Amino acid sequence: MRQLRGWLVAVGMLVPVAAAAQGGQRGQGGAPRLLTVDDLFALKEVGEPQISPDARWVAYTVTTTDLKAEKSESRLWMAPLAGGEGGAVPLTVPGSSASAPRWSPDGRYVSFLAARKTGAPGDSEPKTQVWALDRRGGEARPLTHVPQGVEAYEWSPDGSKLVLVIRDTFPTWTSSKAARPWVITRLQFKRDEVGYLDTLRTHLYVFTPASNALTQITSGNYDDTEPAWRPDGKSIAFASNRSDNPDGNLDTNIWIVVADNADRGKTLRQVTTNPGPDGQPAWSPDGQWIAYVTVVEPDLIWYATDHLAVVPAQGGGGAPQVLTRTLDRNLARPRFSPDGKAIYFLVDDHGERDVARIELSGKNLSRPIAGELDVRSFALGPNGALAALIATPARPGEIFRLERGQVKQVTFTNDSVLAGLRLASVEKTRFPSRDGTQIEGFVYTPPGFARGTPPPAPALLRIHGGPVAQYTWAFNFEAQLLAARGYVVIHVNPRGSSGYGQDFCRAIWADWGNKDYDDVMAGVDDAVRRGYADPKRLGVGGWSYGGILTNYVITKTDRFAAAISGASEVLYAANYGHDHYQYEWERELGLPWKNRELWERLSPFNAVERIVTPTLLMGGDKDWNVPVQNVEQLYQALRRLGRPTELVVYPGQSHRIRTPSYLKDRLERYLAWYDRYVKGTGGTVTGLER
């Protein structure tokens, strides 16, 4: 729910990245065209870069979406880290997805997770297993045969073992025709994309491929995740909330378990004792330190800044040290440098997501990769090589390598599609909110748009989710599509967003729809004042918290000709015990029967009579993040009041719409709704109209 950035320390990085983003659009015959909805299925998503032990190759995933087949599929690819077009080769075959690529320590194998038929008895419904592929050729073979499947894994440093994350299983259910009933005893009993939660937990196992031996090394009524091998292979660090009531707090700590223990983890050693969440452990090369992500003020739940900390791995070695208190920016994915003297991590800062580096002493913070970009992930090689997945407004994520302080492009996955497109121009903006607070955002202008040439364009305020997230310099397909349709698209990072410090983020604590409303409206006013936006042709919308803030907007103003509220909340007390935010609701708003006035005052539903804006409402019927009952309630009220409205519910979809035809349908409905009410052109949906 949160993301990252930092100051422009390495200003020189702006030039090579921007040049790569534009120069990669090598022309084909014919004039460039505008982006369309169908380009969503032509563009591919690159992910999970992993550098080989000899630093010569980078393995990664490429995800494609097939509209006709109604599925997405991820395949493993490999490219020479030195770069060069034509060097990328696929490692896995079409027909089944592969994820979580890892190199075996000797560099011979690329392993991955996949749910494929293995040929074993009872394999009619294959579970996710660890597979291995000899990079020199041949077919992939399964390493594991775990009946319930594997959720995550990591190789031991010597390559002789793997640590697996495996979920418990139920005893056999006696009925073959009726599903097992859910018997709930937990405080937290739902999770989006999972459904009802039971008492089954994830634990760590050590698997030895040579003997097929599988040994459980943790147990108990706790979830154990994020395993990381100590460099000598003797122990494993992991994250787990082992408090008396794990569902009633965020007290995840770092623990260490001996890799060859035979007592199922009864003799664990707790490394951190912070009352808030500690996670993402990473070992120093000498095994003396563990770097991890921590929260200093856990009572602020998701508004608290994620910090980088280190702790001695040996008991009695000293207290944890928080290295980034003065940075005050959310960060993630710490990794030690090969010499152990510094730690690399991702950091959100003012609409960027950079790769940062800080010494183990907490001194000399720098940004090896920074600028008008969004680093989605990165990998370090044993020789210090760094590969990063970088997106820009003109290019979805591709893999780059860091070389002598500059980034060089390694993969060119989407060049053939991008070469024929005319994309929107993107400008970062800064303006004061109503109380004088400085707010930042981005403005997308249609291809060929000239500011100051009358008339200004119809404009759409699109609000990000979270609320603890930020718009960045990443490629944004939705914004590019709307701009191609002739709209100026306004993105604002209002208070509550990450990337601007904890005080900025916590400013909306128990006060949603107030300061953040002022901030997004100030972004609209700024676009109007500077000649981008036509004040008489405005639309608004968003998904998740973007939809929630949209609900506040349309209860407070009639300036917008159209609104789209997706997967939003509206009557907050009705969500208590129904969505998966039990703990967060109580921390921020208190118990609804004890603090009823606040719950009611914040709920946009109680101002529904003020809404006059034509509003399209959307959601998935299996969403346990922000349940569809919310948009159903708002739809019912607007229909009763005689307001122009429609409700679209996507079958079988969670908070994230995944079915390709529904993704297409949603975008087409966006365009049709805005065209009809903002442009007044009578837009229609050509997709799945029922």
Residue ranges and their predicted role:
Residues 55-58, 107-110, 159-163, 236-237, ...:
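Hydrophobic beta-strand positions that form the internal "hydrophobic ladder"
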